[in-house]
């Protein structure tokens, strides 16, 4: 037999043998340490791992969630019902505007019913929900006599129009025509039929093509004149047959009585005081002039009689009324008709 060339000593062999014998024992001891010793009274208890838990919803919060869900469900149901009703209303024949008889009109005293229903001519045989109420309202308010209007649907197949008409305050001479005019300068044709009998002065000095803003400014002058003349309660404005507002700096009024018509220049202020001066001295002036056509009261210290007449027909004013004696040719003439006004009668 071949021998190992490396010699082994007795101690080395015994050491190797003991090492092999102890290896399984050491492994067994290691695994045995992993097993819990249930019977050991000194066994340390295992540490519990903390578990984080969120707060549970309270009973009130749960009730709120339920209520919110119920409300949401009710809203969904209502929305569905509304959509169904809307679809039915938009397509059902029951909501059709059959004729102009289905249009109710109220508040029209000076306008005919047909003037208003003509605005809805294109809506006949249409569904009332397809009628643009706001647009029709604007169209109705564009009618001269209408100041404001309301348009509403009346289920199932009617429309109601309620109008508020303008209130005329005077007649306006526009070219060869005489129309009614309100406080804002809006011109209106004579009503087709009315039980009201108007007694207004005629306002001259307006033109058909001038903008509404210009007429509105002229009407403010007229209203201020009437307000001052009637402030004392004597209603002096009723004695006016014509008011010329063509010149804002010289408002001219025609006063007509049994002895004739007189054109009075009132200027742009102190209308009441100047008119009172005219009424107080009218008889005196007429006693001095056989034909008193006009009186100029624009100047504080003088009164000019017949300033619109020819100079040859003028005479000096009474010294008691006008200390500074003036003749019409000397005073600044005002633009007015040269003869007495008989055409501007109260209508």
Curated annotation (Swiss-Prot):
Main location: membrane
Biased composition (Basic and acidic residues): 10-33
Low complexity bias (residue ranges): 313-340
UniProt name for this protein: Cell division protein FtsQ
Keyword Transmembrane: yes
Keyword Transmembrane: yes
GO cellular component annotations of the record: cell division site; plasma membrane
Periplasmic side: 88-347
Organism: Koribacter versatilis (strain Ellin345)
Membrane topology: Single-pass type II membrane protein
Domain POTRA: 98-166
Residues annotated as transmembrane: 67-87
Family according to the record: Belongs to the FtsQ/DivIB family. FtsQ subfamily.
Biological classification of the source: Bacteria, Pseudomonadati, Acidobacteriota, Terriglobia, Terriglobales
InterPro entries per UniProt: Cell_div_FtsQ/DivIB_C, FtsQ, FtsQ_C_sf, POTRA, POTRA_FtsQ_type
Keywords: Cell cycle, Cell division, Cell inner membrane, Cell membrane, Membrane, Transmembrane, Transmembrane helix
Record-level GO BP terms: cell septum assembly; FtsZ-dependent cytokinesis
Subcellular location, record wording: Cell inner membrane
Stretches of the chain found on the membrane's Cytoplasmic side: 1-66
Main function: Essential cell division protein.
Classification via Pfam families: FtsQ_DivIB_C, POTRA_1
Region listing for Disordered, in residue ranges: 1-55, 308-347
């Amino acid at each position: 037999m071949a021998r190992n060339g490396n010699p082994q000593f007795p101690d080395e062999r015994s050491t190797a043998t003991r090492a092999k014998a102890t290896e399984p024992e050491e492994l067994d001891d290691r695994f045995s340490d992993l097993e819990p010793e249930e019977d050991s009274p000194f066994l340390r208890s295992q540490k519990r791992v903390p578990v984080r838990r969120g707060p549970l919803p309270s009973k009130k919060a749960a009730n709120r969630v339920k209520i919110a869900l119920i409300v949401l469900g009710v809203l969904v149901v209502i929305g569905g019902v509304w959509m169904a009703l809307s679809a039915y209303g938009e397509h059902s024949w029951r909501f059709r505007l059959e004729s102009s008889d289905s249009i109710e009109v109220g508040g029209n005293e000076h306008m005919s019913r047909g003037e208003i229903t003509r605005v809805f001519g294109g809506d006949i045989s249409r569904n009332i929900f397809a009628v643009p109420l706001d647009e029709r309202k604007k169209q109705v308010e564009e009618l001269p006599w209408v100041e404001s209007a309301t348009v509403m649907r009346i289920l199932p197949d009617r429309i109601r129009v309620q109008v508020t008409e303008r209130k005329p305050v005077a007649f306006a001479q526009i070219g060869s025509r005489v129309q009614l005019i309100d406080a804002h300068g809006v011109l209106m044709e004579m009503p087709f039929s009315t039980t009201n009998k108007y007694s207004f002065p005629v306002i001259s000095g307006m033109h058909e093509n001038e903008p509404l803003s210009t007429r509105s400014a002229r009407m403010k002058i007229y209203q201020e004149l009437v307000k001052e003349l009637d402030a004392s309660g004597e209603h002096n404005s009723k004695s006016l047959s014509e008011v010329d507002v063509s010149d804002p700096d010289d408002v001219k009024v025609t006063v007509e009585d049994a002895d004739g018509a007189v054109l009075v220049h009132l200027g742009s202020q102190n209308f009441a005081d100047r008119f009172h001066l005219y009424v107080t001295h009218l008889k005196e002036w007429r006693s001095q002039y056989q034909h008193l056509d006009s009186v100029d009261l624009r100047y504080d210290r003088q009164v000019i009689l017949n300033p619109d007449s020819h100079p040859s027909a003028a005479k000096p004013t009474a010294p008691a009324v006008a200390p500074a004696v003036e003749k019409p040719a000397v005073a600044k003439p005002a633009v007015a008709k040269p003869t007495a006004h008989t055409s501007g009668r109260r209508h």
